[in-house]
Amino acid sequence: MKTFVAKPHEVKRDWFVIDAKGKVLGRVASEVAHRLRGKHKPEFTPHVDTGDYIVIINAADIVVTGNKAQDKKYFRHTTYPGGIRETNFEKMQQRFPGRAIQKAVKGMLPKGPLGYAMIKKLKVYAGAEHPHTAQQPKPLEF
């Protein structure tokens, strides 16, 4: 008996939609990363992108527990000397509602070309509307 190895052109991908309204950031991010990677499928292969497409709606209404809204820091750099900038979760949500969930999921995916391909299958929208109705995404509850 041989171990099954998925081939990139034979992978069947589904579309799922997740309503993030009132859900905790880390719990949503870990489930999304799991599904983007394809670990929920029996044909999972570590070196092949076997994951599904995920659409997250209501990203502006995602929550964090405790004092993380003020205490959690996000860093970026302007590429100029001394150009490090920091912002907290609250300000990030006001300015870019989908970026916090995107950064959380990206940190949970593999680094390198395979991880970059996986994060492209994540679509995040601040409101309840999304342009992917033609793909008929199935609602995902957890």
Swiss-Prot record:
UniProt KW keywords: Ribonucleoprotein, Ribosomal protein
Family label: Belongs to the universal ribosomal protein uL13 family.
Chaperone is among the record's keywords: no
Domain of life, source organism: Bacteria
Matches recorded under SUPFAM superfamilies: Ribosomal protein L13
GO cellular component: cytosolic large ribosomal subunit
A GO MF label: mRNA binding
Function description: This protein is one of the early assembly proteins of the 50S ribosomal subunit, although it is not seen to bind rRNA by itself. It is important during the early stages of 50S assembly.
Single biological process term from Gene Ontology: negative regulation of translation
Official protein name in the record: Large ribosomal subunit protein uL13
This protein's record includes keyword Aminoacyl-tRNA synthetase: no
InterPro entries hit by this protein: Ribosomal_uL13, Ribosomal_uL13_bac-type, Ribosomal_uL13_sf
Assembly with partners or alone: Part of the 50S ribosomal subunit.
